[in-house]
Amino acid sequence: MLSTMQDVPLLISRILTHGSTVHGTSRVTTWTGEAEPHRRTYAEIGARSAQLAHALRDGLGVRGDERVATLMWNNAEHVEAYYAIPSMGAVLHTLNLRLPAEQLAWIVNHAADRVVIVNGSLIPLLAPLLPKLPTVEHIVVSGPGDRAPLQDATARVHEYEELIAGRPTAYDWPELDERRAAAMCYTSGTTGDPKGVVYSHRSIYLHSMQVNMAESMGLTDQDTSLVVVPQFHVNAWGLPHAALMTGVNMLMPDRFLQPAPLAEMIERERPTHAAAVPTIWQGLLAELTARPRDVSALTQVTIGGSACPPSLMEAFDELGMRVCHAWGMTETSPLGTVARPPAGSIGTDEEFAYRLTQGRFAVGVQARLTGPGGERIPWDGESAGELEVRGPWIAGAYYNGPDAEPLRPADKFSEDGWLKTGDVGTISPDGFLTLTDRAKDVIKSGGEWISSVELENALMSHPDVAEAAVVAVPDEKWGERPLATVVLREGASADFETLRAFLAEEGKIAKWQLPERWTVIATVPKTSVGKFDKKVLRRQYAEGGLDVTRLG
């Protein structure tokens, strides 16, 4: 027996139509660094999204599920792209502007992006890559910035405002299959090449509803959310989609992500909510300590990407900002857990302990812990295992594997289809997750991941280096940073500055990933099967047993 309910597909275009009409007076405010920020209502966002869709279809010839990439900061035009591209049936591909150039080029080519919408200030990042991007036919430039580096581009260059000007402000959005691809993000490639995660209209719609639930972020049209988490970072944790569902106003920082402008926009625009990784909040705390401001409107802060130090959480409590942990990853859209303490703990000593966990699982996320032998680990708050999840907004494969088939590597997906997160932790009987380690030795720095293997391979390509092991060590500012331990070849005398420069120049390692901490060791400790025993190195560092040099 089937129900008598209507079968209406869950589409991003329905979120756009709802937000631009029912919540048409809500606004996206984009910080400009000038006396007055730029303001645009959701009604205007809806009209301009339609114009952009017409421009992409009629002006640039985008058809079907072709990919349109964005290389942009958080701003109103990026929100328009968020809605126009998937609503017309194409696929939004947000590019991580912090990736090394080679990875960016690989990702664009792997996704076969046909159009790139870029902020003018990011042209210096894009222009050198264009000769390596054969699929890109059009470049659309938005906002201030020198266009000169694009003058020799073989792709056609368009101005965003000129491209959409005069086009219809209404679009007959197609009735798509809700399972159709809407957007894609690539993982940061901690093991091998980056991997593409493709989100459906259905998954984004359901995830947005979860973001808005009271036990998640619980935002309404009375709120303004300062969206610091980048729109290229797992769709800004779902906030741009969730906001138009409930009319949440958005304050977008554009490229002004430094502590001083963030403090100024909090004081001037008075957001009630903000979302970012811990390193942003550490910098903001230092700024507010040095130069106090009225930030009393901001009462709720969502932190993800890495754990928030208890001292930072307590410091923001004193400022009246309640920090709330959330956990997720690119493959989980990303919302998996949110750390809102259960009712019985409020006002007790247990409340803060609950807040320090990664949180309780959302209703759409099933979770289990698996031991080394594949055994199921109980939810007892003590027994640790690798976290595996599944649900309607959880990836079941990666995009475009061999023979263009979905890629399901055994280290990422179980035989019965669950996502292996690579995170190790415990789950309490009432469903609160506490992460204790990484299954692999990924370094989480400021909410972004650094591959220890990539650094090791680059180091060991230096002629003076016999072996190299890189491990994560605690860092007050970034959460974790890489420690490079190297074994020099006999007679070699390479200094650390030289090795660091080699990583950047020959190893093509992004500047922010370069280690500051270095040490020479006689040999890399190994396990019984010959693998690097990194826990020994971490213990030696913690106990002060390594002679570490810290570079500036």
Regions found by a protein language model. Name each.
Residues Y205-T224, V234-T272, E287:
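Conserved AMP-binding/adenylation subdomain of ANL enzymes
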Residues V28-N75, V79-Y83, P100-A105, E159-E162:
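Conserved AMP-binding/adenylate-forming core of the ANL superfamily
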Residues S142, K508-F532, R550-G552:
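AMP-binding/adenylate-forming catalytic domain of the ANL superfamily
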Residues G59-R63, R167-R180, M184-L226, G238, ...:
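Conserved adenylate-forming
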Residues D58, S87-A165, R489-A492:
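Structural core segment of the AMP-binding/adenylate-forming
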Residues L99, A105, V116-G120, G391, ...:
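AMP-binding/adenylate-forming catalytic core of the ANL superfamily
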Residues R268-A276, Q282-A353, Q366, G373-P378:
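Gly/Ser/Thr-rich phosphate-binding loop
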Residues R360-G364, P372-K412, E448-I450:
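Conserved ATP/PPi-binding loop(s) of AMP-dependent carboxylate-activating enzymes
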